[in-house]
């Protein structure tokens, strides 16, 4: 899909047009825009990324909480990480991004580690249909959280 998108942009770039891609969150973290920029830059096109507000910072603000303190590490992990159990075992706060598709497995891993009560989920932060669960132990297991689901796991 990324190659096809880059191919669709090439005629516009070859014609001397500027092309922009809007992005939810920041383009430097798990963003399609970053993949496209890499493909186009490898073909010799000039690319530039503009910073945005990371989705997990927006989620923390929505929850009215800080992500971490000066003495606590912060781990940012894709929800589909194959080593999720190992990531959850690390000291510090965790951000599980784009967790919606893998939510049943993520919830099970959090439950096994006794972390549901210390975990919060926000889906579609700042968008229509926003869902906020400050305590994942009350999240309805049958509910679909959607693609833009972010989970914050805090330390004790």
Where are the predicted features?
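Short, glycine/serine-rich, charged loops/turns that create anion-binding
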Residues: 26-28, 54, 101, 126
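Short beta-strand/turn micro-motifs composed of small residues
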Residues: 23, 78, 123
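A contiguous loop/helix-start segment that scaffolds small-molecule binding in enzyme catalytic cores
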Residues: 19, 88-156
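Short, structurally constrained coil/turn elements
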Residues: 15, 70, 113-115
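Structural motif
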Residues: 22-24, 50, 97
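Structural motif corresponding to alpha-helix initiation and N-cap regions
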Residues: 3-6, 78-81, 103
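Class I SAM-dependent methyltransferase SAM-binding "motif I" and its flanking Rossmann-like core
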Residues: 28-90, 142
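Class I S-adenosyl-L-methionine
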Residues: 1-46, 133, 139-141, 146-150, ...
């Amino acid at each position: 899909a990324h190659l096809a998108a880059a191919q669709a942009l090439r005629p516009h770039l070859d014609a001397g047009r500027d092309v922009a891609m809007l992005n939810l969150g920041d383009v430097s973290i798990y963003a399609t825009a970053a993949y496209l920029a890499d493909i186009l830059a490898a073909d010799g096109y000039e690319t530039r990324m503009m910073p945005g507000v990371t989705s997990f910072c927006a989620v923390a603000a929505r929850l009215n909480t800080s992500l971490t303190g000066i003495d606590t590490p912060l781990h940012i992990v894709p929800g589909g990480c194959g080593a999720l159990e190992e990531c959850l075992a690390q000291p510090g706060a965790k951000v599980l991004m784009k967790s919606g598709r893998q939510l049943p497995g993520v919830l099970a891993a959090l439950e096994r580690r006794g972390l549901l009560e210390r975990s919060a989920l926000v889906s579609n932060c700042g968008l229509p249909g926003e869902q906020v669960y400050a305590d994942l132990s009350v999240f309805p297991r049958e509910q679909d959280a959607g693609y833009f689901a972010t989970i914050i796991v805090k330390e004790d």
